[in-house]
């Protein structure tokens, strides 16, 4: 009964009345023009959420409209909800060939990500359209799904291994997994030898995060941590991804950095000669080369935000 089925306009008394859609759009346009004339184009912001990235027309139109008014206040679910992803990549670098896709992989680790409900996951996790069906289909082909989350989510109910860790301890878990992977030689040694710097320094940094120590902070057993590390490290294809929650928790950037680290040391990238998904159908092709792209700063350039003075 409360579903909005027609265009409404709020009256001064706070109630709503119906209005012709074209008239509503005209009135909105007039008000936006007045705001831009009085305060400048930056006063108008655009926010594109996760669903906007799954709607090619909406994403393109929103960008074009925003550019037409000359505003720099363009925000997305990455810049607002998950800034750790861009910030970690800005100091880590990237593999131009891209990481493994979900389809065809034999493992996927979901850290604080519940795509069954959110219909969202970073690339490498279950695609947003019918994620449960995609998870079920890949598991039938042998994929192992690891879920790490303080809550037993819907995705956890469909996983092969679930670790119900304490909130805010994602970096502890990931450090322990990397420690086990390196200690047991489960990393991609050839890939690391050619493309990874400071591997020995990484080994030293994660050494204190033994399964026993991590378990005392995570609230799970050491055996579960080792099982997760071996399940991920022994796989051939598949990546770890994080959702919104880990980025909003303490040390969110570190969490994303460690996820990039885990995927990298395990060599979960598209290498020379491998097939890549969607080489370019609705958008121009992006060159996919088997090489490293140096880290590029994510800040200290472009217009400054007003929120910090």
Predicted regions mapped to residue ranges:
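Short, amphipathic alpha-helical segments that act as regulatory/interfacial helices
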Residues: 29-32, 178, 229, 259-267
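Flexible, glycine/charged-enriched surface loops at secondary-structure junctions
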Residues: 39-43, 187-192, 239, 270-277
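N-terminal export/assembly segments and adjacent metallocofactor-ligating motifs
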Residues: 1-184, 221
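Core structural elements
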Residues: 203-208, 225-236
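Flexible glycine/proline-enriched surface loops and loop-helix/loop-strand junctions
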Residues: 114, 158-159, 209-213, 241-246
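A glycine-rich, hydrophobic/aromatic-adjacent loop/helix-cap motif
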Residues: 232-309
């Amino acid at each position: 009964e409360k579903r909005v089925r027609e265009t409404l306009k709020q009256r001064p008394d706070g109630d709503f009345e119906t209005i012709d859609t074209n008239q509503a759009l005209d009135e909105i346009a007039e008000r936006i023009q007045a705001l831009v004339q009085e305060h400048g184009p930056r006063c108008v912001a655009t926010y594109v959420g996760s669903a906007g990235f799954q709607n090619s027309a909406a994403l393109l139109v929103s960008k074009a409209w925003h550019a037409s008014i000359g505003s720099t206040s363009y925000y997305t679910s990455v810049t607002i909800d998950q800034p750790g992803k861009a910030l970690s990549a800005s100091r880590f670098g990237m593999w131009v060939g891209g990481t493994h896709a979900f389809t065809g992989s034999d493992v996927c680790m979901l850290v604080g990500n519940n795509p069954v409900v959110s219909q969202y996951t970073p690339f490498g996790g279950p695609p947003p359209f019918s994620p449960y069906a995609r998870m079920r289909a890949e598991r039938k082909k042998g994929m192992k799904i690891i879920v790490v989350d303080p809550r037993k989510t819907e995705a956890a109910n469909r996983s092969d291994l679930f670790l119900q860790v304490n909130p805010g301890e994602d970096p502890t878990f990931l450090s322990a997994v990397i420690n086990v992977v390196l200690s047991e030689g489960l990393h991609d040694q050839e890939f690391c030898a050619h493309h990874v710097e400071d591997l020995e320094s990484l080994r030293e940094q994660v050494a204190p995060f033994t399964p026993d120590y991590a378990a005392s902070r995570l609230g799970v057993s050491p055996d579960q941590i080792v099982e997760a590390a071996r399940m991920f490290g022994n796989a051939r294809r598949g990546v770890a991804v994080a959702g919104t929650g880990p980025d909003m928790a303490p040390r969110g950037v570190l969490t994303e950095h460690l996820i990039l680290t885990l995927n990298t040391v395990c060599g979960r990238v598209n290498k020379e000669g491998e097939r890549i998904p969607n080489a370019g159908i609705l958008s121009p092709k992006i060159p996919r080369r088997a090489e490293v792209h140096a880290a590029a700063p994510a800040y200290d350039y472009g217009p400054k935000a007003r929120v910090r003075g």
